[in-house]
Amino acid sequence: MKTMKLKGLFLCLVFLLCNAISHAADDLITRQVTIKLDKAGTLPDKIGSSKKYKITNLKIIGEINGTDWRLIRDMASEDDYGRTKGKLSTLDLSEAKIVKGGSFYYNDDGSKTSNDVLGPYAFSDCPCLTNLTLPSGVTEIGDFAFRNCKGLTSLTLPSGVTKIGRCAFWDCYGLTSLTLPSGVTEIGYDAFKDCYGLTSLTLPSGVAEIKSGTFCDCSGLTSLSLPSGLTSIGESAFSGCSGLTDLTLPSGVTEIGIYAFSGCSGLTSLTLSSGISIGGSAFKGCSGLKTVSFCINDDLETYLTKGHSYIDVDCAIKYYLSGEEITSIVIPSSVTTLGEYAFQRCSTLQAVYVSWPTPISAGSAFSGVGISKCTLYVPQGTETDYFLADVWGYFGNIVEYDPTGIDKVTTSTDAKELSRYSVNGQRLSAPAKGLNIVKYSDGSVKKVAVQ
């Protein structure tokens, strides 16, 4: 009898506990709560302290300032002291306007609101937010504005936005879809760092510079459209973007920073334009890179070192790839000088293609390469000249080929491949190891070294 009473008491307690939990969940306000503000800074007067942590869906109409924003952050589970009990997940500010004034909304001596600016740290560390509509008048996204907003899966920025601050979306790894307005001209460094949920992105035509770390570790990114006006790609800009498989850089790009594409292990094809300056280890760890197209207008040593203090003396060509993985290299006729140790320790080099009618001085350019095991491809009728020349004559095999008719290296993304040939003029049905000659629909012809 006593045992039955204890069991009954236990079941009663379980029932009361479950009921309390259910009641707590039911206590959340899930319907949309719409609040119209007649004056900025009055949101705290509209929402009592007993309700602010229960509202999950909020729409605000009217002007809002720092005082209002401080409460919004509190309701979205973050304040100056860390995590709060806020449950705000859906926020509609489509009919709101951000204005200057009010209290600091982030730290007591930190950020204040400015007219039509989504300020620094506006939603930083608010993981509860899953759906957000910004005021239509916003023109700028501040630094760290959405940092660590892990709950956001998609976001459309207002059409008037022209600037995105540094680290603005850092660690928003839940973000899978993002539309950037056409008027955006500036994106801060580390802006999308660790957004590995993003799969595709189109950069607006006005963006001329991709700054350091902008897309660092966006491993889910498989499709990227770069604007034609792009001129510079910063340090580690795409480092760790292992999902990228092919990339054509706009012809206007003149500089690629150090480690810019390091760790892009999925990259298999790359097109570089002439006159480009490439930083050290820019393609380090690109183990899948098999096809590289480029042309050089300076002598090789000057070209590779131009504008950089980071010089890899072991193998300058590492600025294109990891030197130990290079099996073939095409040296354009525009190269007039081979600098000392230009290919030093490229131990896997198997083929070198040149097009000079008369051998130029090679000096110590191939020191440590082991050219006795390499094949040298030279213009027709010049095999004897190269055989008798210093350095060139030490190549294990010298083969003549016809390099004529090679017009230019194209970087156009519109041109389509029409046909592909070997250096002997044989039609190829697919890329073949060594030098391929490819004709395109725009009339251009490209030499492509396939490893």
What do these predicted regions represent?
Residues 10-19:
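Bacterial N-terminal signal peptides
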Residues 20-25:
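Sec/Tat signal peptide C-region and signal peptidase I cleavage site
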Residues 422-442:
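Short, surface-exposed loop/turn motifs with a glycine/proline- and acidic-biased composition
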Residues 119-122, 142-147, 165-170, 188-193, ...:
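Consensus positions within tandem repeat domains that build extended binding/scaffold surfaces
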Residues 30-38, 56-64, 86-116, 127-140, ...:
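Structural signature of tandem-repeat unit edges
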Residues 41-51, 67-77, 281-282, 340-344, ...:
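Short, T/G/N/S-enriched strand-turn elements that build extracellular solenoid repeat scaffolds
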Residues 401-424:
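Residue-level detector of functionally pivotal "anchor" positions at catalytic/ligand-binding pockets or at interdomain
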Residues 4-6, 437-451:
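C-terminal tail/sorting-segment detector
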